[in-house]
């Protein structure tokens, strides 16, 4: 009888690949392609649970994955901005909400249940959207599962942030309880590198207000390996990170980052990303073959070469629930190189203003603003453009009428240093409502002791090219 053989094969095939490649519950390939796996993540373990009587959803990965679903894309928010096609994930889809519903019922996770209730209260038909789709539709599961949606602690009871260190993701929101009043920051520095649908955005961050993107990864997923898709969406130049001598991070697992330290609380949170090993020539046999097949050149002219990079550590401190974040970059190379600090927007052009103390870059959306104040040693050469390195041409995706909708341009800011072996950037970002009357009081002030005061926070940071990298953040509010 072949039945035992097939049963053994199917079970072990699922076990080798699922539920995830890690224990923290996140999906390193990004939010868009996470949805491709939803039916497999639910229907297969549900079948095995019914056959054996053992609850396969008791794997701790599923509890972590519920937090990934919530923190990476809070209710009514755009995706955190990782992986191919992330820019198309504007709000939680019906398949995502349906998946959270299944998780809540099968694991008893009340945070996922609250996520579902909040979204369905405003979008009562959302569980019908995509319910029969090939990859994410869970209509068959819902016809069989009679477990109730659990009650208990909800989104207001969660910490303001969560870090997934094995996957290399972090996300912080000032109000998971109410996205309309929430400043969000997402971050990636991943051991998985930029292979498959993951992108070369080690040590990159994105900001949001009311679920709308502000500083955000740019480019379009025109296809998996065409020139725009690789040079302008997958490559580091598309993300809010750093270029070294104009060069970006390797494509492949070799271009990796990691999160060595993190701390989360509602008073102050911290995450450190290390992308020191991410840069250099593309050496992945798989991606070299794909490049050859697609007429791609991983050349210095296109942004890949040896850089002599020794250290790229990015420290991010979220200053409570104030909407302020502080970012400190420690950079070092074997020889003097230029260091380019990148920011991007996909909704509106950026406003840029240079003062003696800092460069002010402002991103806006319909309801929100991110003000970035960039400090460094010496004078930075700045440039802002609305042009991609390679134009985005929609040659692949037509609608039902055969119309190929044009891809819009995005906006790109670059601040480049002179050649230095050691360099530091310090950035204060304030993300807030566009109509915030207190915005005029948020401009950073340089004090006599060279520290920076902004709001109730005092920051000391070594941005010179001498001495050890260091920073200190203190809250100065009394009482």
Residues of each region from the PLM?
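Short, small-residue-biased leader/transition segments that mark boundaries at the very start
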Residues: 1-3
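Secondary-structure capping and boundary motifs in well-ordered enzyme cores
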Residues: 6-13, 30-40, 58-66, 112, ...
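Active-site-adjacent bridging/hinge elements
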Residues: 7-21, 179-185, 307, 394-407
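Long, repeat-rich segments with strong aromatic
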Residues: 15-16, 20-22, 27-43, 48, ...
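Aromatic/acidic polysaccharide-binding cleft in carbohydrate-active enzymes
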Residues: 82-93, 97, 214-235, 240
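CBM-like, beta-strand-rich accessory domains located in the C-terminal region of large
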Residues: 130, 221-479
